[in-house]
Regions:
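HIT superfamily nucleotide-processing domains
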Residues: 1-129
Length: 129
């Protein structure tokens, strides 16, 4: 699923202006600029590629291992009741920044009236099953 869209020369994820919460050989983690919950964090590969599907196997593995570390940090800091993890890939998938990234989103009891379905809610009529 290689995307042809190119970020402007100053990619906001290639040169993040936020505190790095955690890092690994192939990835960085920092707070989302527009968090949907307290602690919402992005795991971003160091190499500029459009989507997580464009990552080399070692980069992909490293990103998800860093996401696990981030989950542990967020659990200790925020004591959430659950998590969502995911990546928006392609325009139809909701991607708005054309540098691959993984969202790690702490979830709290009561933050939405009907949490069942989780990420399935991206298509509301398909959330219930």
């Amino acid at each position: 699923m290689t995307q042809t869209r190119v970020n402007p020369p100053a990619c906001i994820f290639c040169t993040p202006d936020r505190e790095i919460l955690a890092e690994s050989p192939h990835a960085l983690a920092f707070a989302d600029a527009y968090p949907v919950s307290p602690g919402h964090t992005l795991v971003v590969p160091r190499r500029h590629v459009a989507t997580v599907f464009d990552l080399a196997e070692d980069e992909y593995s490293d990103c998800f291992l860093l996401a696990l570390k981030v989950q542990e940090l967020l659990a200790a800091r925020h004591a959430p009741d659950g998590f969502n993890i995911g990546a928006n890939c392609g325009e139809a998938g909701g991607q708005s920044v054309w540098h691959a990234h993984i969202h790690v989103i702490p979830r709290f009891a009561g933050d939405t009236p009907h949490p069942r379905g989780g990420v399935r809610n991206v298509i509301p009529r398909k959330a219930a099953y």
